[in-house]
Design a protein with these regions (language model features):
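Glycine- and small/polar-enriched repetitive beta-structure motifs of secreted/surface proteins
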Residues: 1-224
Length: 224
């Protein structure tokens, strides 16, 4: 039998059979949970679809609402991880963060951070709209408003700074540190830009190294 559960709200724990140490607060929070344990859901429809998974935390209306069997996820914010179904060990903090995610080990902090991510794994995005177009790209790190915001399928980019790598879509293995660094880069790979506006205009030029404020800022397609 279920034990040590705390529930308050319409349909909370309606299907619970043997799950322990769960907390559900809000209409339909943890409504379909059967055997999962150590879950916390606060908000209307929070973790509504969860059935057997453990160690999930969802705070906010619809947070983690579609999650069924994914474990060890944290969703804080309205619609955070809202339609995610099976992903595990994800952290989404901010409205709509990781909203459609199904992959594992992603961290998104900020309004709409990684909102479009589906199967991309092992990403870190911090900042409003950070990596928000990413769908399948993995092992990317972005920090700053709209950093890597156009990235869709590229892997292994590191982008730190306001609008750094803003336009990048499929370029991989780039490093951009600084305000507007590699801002216009779209498909080029293996660039390193350190400094405000370093390689800012670069679009398709690959294998460049630019260190310092405005370093190679006008370079577009060349390799230096």
């Amino acid at each position: 039998a279920a034990s040590n559960n705390t529930g308050f709200g319409n349909e909370v724990f309606d299907d619970l059979t043997s799950g322990d140490a769960n907390t559900g607060v809000g209409s339909q929070a943890l409504a379909k949970l059967t055997t999962g344990g150590d879950n916390t859901a606060v908000g209307q429809n929070a973790l509504d679809a969860l059935t057997t998974a453990d160690y999930n935390t969802a705070v906010g209306a619809n947070a983690g609402g579609a999650l069924t069997t994914g474990a060890a996820n944290t969703a804080v914010g309205n619609d955070a991880l809202e339609t995610a179904t099976t992903g595990a060990a994800n952290t989404a903090i901010g409205a709509y963060a990781l909203r459609v995610n199904t992959a594992d080990n992603n961290t998104a902090v900020g309004n709409q951070a990684m909102i479009a991510n589906t199967t991309g794994a092992n990403n870190v995005a911090v900042g409003t709209f950070a990596t928000d177009a990413n769908t399948t790209g993995s092992e990317n790190t972005s920090m700053g408003h709209a950093s890597l915001s156009s990235n869709t399928t590229a892997d292994a980019n590191t982008s730190v700074g306001f609008t750094s790598m803003l336009a990048n879509t499929t370029g991989a293995y780039n490093v951009a540190v600084g305000h507007n660094s590699l801002k216009a880069n779209t498909t080029a790979a293996n660039n390193t830009a350190v400094g405000a506006s370093a390689l800012e205009a670069n679009t398709t030029g690959a294998d460049n190294v630019a260190i310092g404020k405005f370093a190679l800022t006008a370079n577009t397609t060349g390799n230096t």
